[in-house]
Amino acid sequence: MEIHHCENPVCRFVTRHAVPDMCPLCGGAFFLPSDGSDLVAADWVTLGIESKTDGRFDDAFSDFEKAAAEGDAAGQCMLGLAYETGEGVAQSWPDAVLLYRAAAGQGHAQAQCNLGWCYEFGKGVPQDAKAAARWYGEAALQHDPRAECCLAICYTNGTGVAADPVRAVQLYTLSAQAGFVPAMRNLAQMIHLGRGTAKNDEAALAWYQKAAAQDDARALFMCGQFYEKGFGVESNAPLAADFYLRAARQGYAPAQACYAICLECGRGVPANPTEAVQWYTRAARQGDTQAQFALAVCCEQGTGTPQSWGDAIRWYSMAAAQELPQALLNLGLCYERGAGVRRNPEEALHLYRRAARLGLPAAENRIGALYERGDGVEQSWPTATAHYRRAAEANYAPAQCNLGWCYEYGQGVPEDLTLAAAWYGKSAAQGFARAQCCLGWCYEFGKGVELDEARAVELYRAAAEQGLPRAQCCLGYCTEKGIGTEADPAAAAEWYRRSAEGGYSRGMYNYACCFENGTGVKKDLPLAQQWYERAAKEGLPDAMYELGVWYEDGRCGPKDAAQALAWYKKAAEAGHDRARKAVERMEKLV
């Protein structure tokens, strides 16, 4: 390609592009062709940058090489960059460092900064944090914005220099004020965290917004975070979602994951689970662990995508491989339950232990459950209780409830109803339904606490309204008998119904009693028998015995001594005393 330069000997405009109508530097209208012999090093640098911008890397390398051969620092630096990136030449860190060093020795700020980076990360030279900081410092003295930012990072992290967040903030500020976007972001983070300066979310957001105005993906993402969480500004879900989307479109994985959450939950945008899965997938394929985990949950539950245990296991495994605690836990649950994989409690235990080492209380709780059952390990109440305690002391509500149960029944620890009630209370205070029900029982019967039937009903109701069948049954019983509340047979029957339909055998039994006696519902013996049968099939001895009575007396059809005896025997085998006596009585008659 032919070279032209401005005829003005003072003007250094030079180009391989089509000759413009007017020189952009001096306004001249005449240009002369050149074979290169009349060009100086700075001209070759200009031509090299033009070629690099056009994507003509071979020409760029040749141009920079000519400038560097004349000892030009800018040419040496740009040639070093070509060796660093492998543009127009085979990539070579040692050659890049050699050229950066030559230019840095001439005081070229960009080369000094580049050389510092090579020392910081051990590229072409042995890693040397102190040398990195020293070269960053040389460039920063010339007010190179990138070097100021790099040196600030050193002071932030104590890399090659003593950590000094105040000095870091000073350098970030200089760099940010010069328009260097990464420094704007880092300065915003320091201000948000209150490191090296007073915490000020409004000021932090202002810097993020300045960087976002340059369409910087990370800054856009952080603006989304601030508007979502209300840091330094009133929470604004639609605006947060818009910032996430702008960053997500640039391929920034954390923003893609957050925008997917907005779509899945309808937060700031109309709910669209299908589109959410698409964004989760984009982020997950980039290795974003939170997106991998969220995508696995969607695949497991069939949210926005067809249900697929295979895909769920695959994404859980990817996130678990990156040591995401919740992914390790969920993958462990899959192995414990045999969901999507062959059941393997030993592998589940291994995964739970990895998650527990990362500080996840829920994993400690699952380890406790395996030891409680002796599932994949030798059964050990003391070991189970120890793991429950670790999770409970980390304020994990299910473990607090489990530990309370251990104290109530003296499993792995000495029986202590006061401690049982105390742990139930900690769990119940967090809204954990099972603990609310257990604590309600303590108050109803004065176990470990002062008897308080009204408080018991209050706790039963809290758990029942969360859908816990046992609590619904307990609340039904209190409501039927007027314990801690006014008697209301109709309301009692309704709570029994909910409990029964939730699969709780005692709720089925009590609901059957309602139909048998017309308590809160119209008397209906066939329905009563159906619910007794369902309760009996769930293994409730009282229901088995009651069916024996019904068949013996013919309460809902012809008498059937054989059926009666069969049900009495089942109840007796389950430890029901009246059923045992009934068996003895009937066998004597035979």
What is the predicted role of each segment?
Residues 27-36:
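Short Cys/His-rich micro-motifs in 6-15 aa windows
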Residues 3-8, 20:
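Residues immediately within or flanking Cys/His clusters that coordinate Zn2+
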Residues 7-15, 27:
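Cys/His-coordinated zinc-binding microdomains
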Residues 39, 69-72, 85-87, 92, ...:
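Short helix-capping/linker turns of helical repeat alpha-solenoids
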Residues 44-52, 78-85, 114-121, 150-157, ...:
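Hydrophobic face of amphipathic alpha-helices that form TPR/SEL1-like repeat modules
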